[in-house]
Amino acid sequence: VLIIAVLFLTACQLTTAETYSRGRQKHRARRSTDKNSKWTRECTRSGGACNSHDQCCANFCRKATSTCM
């Protein structure tokens, strides 16, 4: 009986969460697209100009010369 009650409550929560998130689906898709574009951005190769570590493919920017290592 306890197992049936747990399954019933889980099903109720899943149904409620699904109907609540339907209105937010457009925003969720846009957010994941933005996240993917950050992951697939271009990086500067070794010897190229940089201002911060995250611009370089190797994630290291030498501040003294402003070049990627």
From Swiss-Prot:
Residues 18-41 form a propeptide. Keywords: Disulfide bond, Knottin, Secreted, Signal, Toxin. GO terms for cellular component: extracellular region. One of its GO terms (molecular function) is toxin activity. Pfam families: Conotoxin. Residues 1-17 form the signal peptide. Disulfide bonds join 43-57, 50-61, 56-68. It comes from the Eukaryota. It is found in: Secreted. Expressed by the venom duct. This precursor corresponds to allele E1h. Has not been merged with other alleles since they may differ due to geographic variation (see strains in PubMed:19606224). Belongs to the conotoxin O1 superfamily. The presence of a 'disulfide through disulfide knot' structurally defines this protein as a knottin. This is Conotoxin Eb6.19. It comes from Conus ebraeus.
